[in-house]
């Protein structure tokens, strides 16, 4: 499906420094925020990235090496002590950014906390994203911890990856949204330990409905594709959700 001219005009082209992504209560310059995120991390943020990277390596080794009992015990003892040490610090859930690309008030916070692309989140592979013209391009290399069928990426992790990359693509319309439906076609197994390329774009916009499409390929061969429907939701609604969570309650969306 081709995007209509009116829909295309709503998308942000990062080569045009004058265009911004606007929130109902704010004007968010996506290009400037993205550029800031690409700068080398420093201070506390840099150390958080370093710690998460080390934790990813621990996870990767744990699921595939036959370490002796004493080595596993020593590692577990050390990690338990460190977990107790971290627990002494106050919990910070300021919601500087939401783990949905289009709704991140602070793009650095979003990138750091996302379970898919967060550099400070050890659960993330992570996927590296870039915006090229009206497309979002993602690069990822899934390790053994993400294995489903022997030697291949678990389909559930691919689904989460599609949701994240499509979420970035729909953010280019300037309307923050949440996933309505996500349909995936697995064409063939997607290999582990291989450079994967995601390519996503908006196909059309109908009112609050944002339609998107994404493929993932390995060595130039498409292994899966996804169609995502996102429903635009005002930034103030996400702020209400954050405030409700901080207050320890839930509000109906």
Task: List each language-model region with its residue ranges.
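HotDog/MaoC-like acyl-thioester-processing domains
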Residues: 19-99, 103, 190-192, 203-253
């Amino acid at each position: 499906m081709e995007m209509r001219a009116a829909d295309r005009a709503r998308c942000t082209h990062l080569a045009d420094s004058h265009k911004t992504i606007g929130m109902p209560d704010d004007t968010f310059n996506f290009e400037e925020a993205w550029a800031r995120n690409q700068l080398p991390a420093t201070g506390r943020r840099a150390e958080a990235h370093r710690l998460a990277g080390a934790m990813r390596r621990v996870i990767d080794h744990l699921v595939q090496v036959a370490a002796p009992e004493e080595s596993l015990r020593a590692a577990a003892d050390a990690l338990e002590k460190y977990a107790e040490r971290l627990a002494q610090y106050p919990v910070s859930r300021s919601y500087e950014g939401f783990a949905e690309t289009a709704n991140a008030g602070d793009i650095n916070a979003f990138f750091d906390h996302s379970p898919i692309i967060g550099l400070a989140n050890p659960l993330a592979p992570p996927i590296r994203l870039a915006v090229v013209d009206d497309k979002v391009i993602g690069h990822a290399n899934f390790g053994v911890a993400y294995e489903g069928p022997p030697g291949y990426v678990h389909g559930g992790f691919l689904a989460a990856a599609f949701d994240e990359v499509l979420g970035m693509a729909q953010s280019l319309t300037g309307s923050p949204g949440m996933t309505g439906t996500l349909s995936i076609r697995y064409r063939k197994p997607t290999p582990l330990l291989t450079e994967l390329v995601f390519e996503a774009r908006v196909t059309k916009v109908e009112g609050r409905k944002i339609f998107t499409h994404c493929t993932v390929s390995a060595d130039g061969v498409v292994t899966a594709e996804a169609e995502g429907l996102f429903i635009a939701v005002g930034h103030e609604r996400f702020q209400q959700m954050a405030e409700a969570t901080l207050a320890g309650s839930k509000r109906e969306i």
